[in-house]
Amino acid sequence: MNLGIYRQGLRFCQCGYDGSNLRPLGEFTGSGHPSFHHNGRWGITDCYIQECFTAPDRSIPLRLIDLGTNTERALTRVDITTPGLARSYNFRLDPHPVWCDNDNFLIFNAMENGARRVFLADMRKFQ
């Protein structure tokens, strides 16, 4: 999850089911909708359109977080500009990247050719 702990902006955090043992996961800037691999090493997240990760063309990165090496990289940038976004922020598209149950694939939302789509990304090389 993302939390604004230590008054240093959003950070990725982890805690027990009851809220105990709250701790940040590395020094990464938190954003969007994080999801973590069952092996505990890999995280994936998107960002909101108003955050610093958004490009001038309004595409946003899918950020792969490596807790094993304390590094991150953008796997890809996705278009989230919906036809209704100019009228209302409520018409935005959030990618919400998540790991599949078998941890071999990511599922995320994005725009393609003016239409909302659901994508599946093969992540087996990151096992």
Q: Where is each model-derived feature located?
A:
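Short, surface-exposed linear patches
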Residues: F36, T45-Y48, G84-A86, A121
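Beta-propeller blade-edge and WD-like acidic-aromatic loop motif
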Residues: G4-P24, Y48-I80, N104-F105, N109-Q127
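Conserved blade-ending motifs and adjacent loop-strand segments that build the rim/top face
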Residues: R23-H37, N70-W99
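Blade-terminus and WD-like Trp-Asp/Gly-His loop motifs, strongest in beta-propeller folds
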Residues: M1-N2, P34-T45, P97-F105
